């Protein structure tokens, strides 16, 4: 595997030898000193050019300059995921030695959005000054409205998890659990970290550093919210998710002076228990579904 120094040398060599490329920046985790360094870090690079057209959808240029990637994605040329259509062209590349470059070929303009960024090359000496704001990565203190909305979204979406299990709709139940419900859980845990660390740390994208900042017992509980595909396992994870969220939310609410809607939590807990125990269907209706649902939780 090529070293980071070798990769940086390659990137700068390509830029220096091409007069159309006027500046180069490095972003992402490699520009952030607070991110732990490892072999999986991407090289998030931007080439600033006057005209993007010659670089647009041109994998032959990529192969000539960087070598043929083992895997290549060109988001701006895809239909499945609508592109941003902002004038930039991205090449996302993984090479045979495992190195990854996310290359953005962009028109000559730069707006400092506060994310860590390093200027690697400025041929004209006119590149705007980059004022790195490290706290851009810190967990942000929520407003009372944002906190309440997170709680409501979390509690509401749990009902879909329960329905999906009861209906034997595994993909749907998993999607609800691991998208809207988990998104809100991770957000609340990030605020919990913020409270404990005075909002001066970053839990990372998707909460990837939560293990570092959460109390160990709470992190163990978080692990228990991930289930297998058996419905019994899913029910246990769903209730653990409910209780973990509630404990974290109470901590955040107390620290920031927000009210926490205990009745809302109680309401979804009672509903989940009704569904789990098969007590919603009128007598004589849905008995077979109820029986199967109970068997799958045993």
Give residue spans per PLM region.
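Short aromatic-enriched loop/helix-cap "lid" or pocket-rim segments at secondary-structure transitions
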Residues: 36-39, 115-116, 203
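Conserved NTP/Mg2+-binding pocket subregion across the NTase superfamily
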Residues: 6, 66-178, 278-281, 298
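Generic secondary-structure boundary/loop-capping signal
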Residues: 63, 115-118, 207, 219
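Conserved nucleotidyltransferase catalytic core and NTase-mimicking acidic/glycine-rich helix/loop elements
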Residues: 138-286, 290, 294, 298
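Metal-dependent nucleotidyltransferase catalytic core
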Residues: 1-19, 27-38, 46-103
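Short, solvent-exposed loop/turn segments at secondary-structure junctions
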Residues: 31-32, 52, 108-110, 195-196
């Amino acid at each position: 595997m090529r070293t980071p120094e070798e990769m940086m040398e390659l990137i700068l060599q390509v830029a220096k030898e091409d007069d159309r490329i006027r500046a180069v920046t490095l972003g992402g985790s490699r520009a952030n000193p607070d991110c732990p360094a490892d072999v999986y870090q991407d090289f998030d690079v931007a080439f600033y050019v006057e005209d993007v057209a010659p670089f647009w959808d041109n994998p032959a240029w990529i192969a000539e300059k960087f070598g043929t990637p083992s895997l290549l994605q060109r988001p701006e040329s895809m239909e499945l995921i609508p592109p941003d259509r902002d004038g930039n062209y991205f090449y996302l590349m993984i090479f045979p030695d495992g190195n990854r470059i996310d290359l953005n070929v962009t028109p000559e303009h730069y707006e400092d959005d506060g994310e860590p960024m390093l200027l690697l090359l400025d041929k004209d000496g006119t590149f705007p000054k980059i004022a790195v704001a490290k706290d851009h990565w810190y967990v942000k203190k929520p407003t009372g409205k944002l906190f309440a909305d997170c709680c409501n979204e979390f509690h509401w979406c749990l009902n879909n998890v329960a329905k999906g299990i009861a209906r034997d709709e595994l993909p749907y139940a998993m999607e609800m659990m691991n998208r809207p419900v988990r998104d809100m859980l991770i957000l609340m845990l990030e605020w919990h970290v913020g409270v404990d660390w005075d909002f001066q740390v970053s839990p990372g994208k998707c909460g990837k550093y939560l293990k570092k900042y959460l109390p160990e017992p709470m992190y163990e509980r978080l692990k228990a919210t991930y289930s297998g595909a058996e419905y019994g396992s899913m029910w246990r994870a769903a209730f653990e998710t409910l209780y973990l969220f509630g404990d974290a939310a109470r901590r955040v609410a107390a620290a920031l002076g927000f009210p926490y809607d205990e009745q809302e939590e109680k309401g979804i807990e009672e509903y989940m228990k009704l569904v789990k125990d098969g007590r919603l269907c009128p007598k004589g209706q849905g008995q077979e579904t109820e029986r199967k649902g109970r068997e799958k939780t045993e």
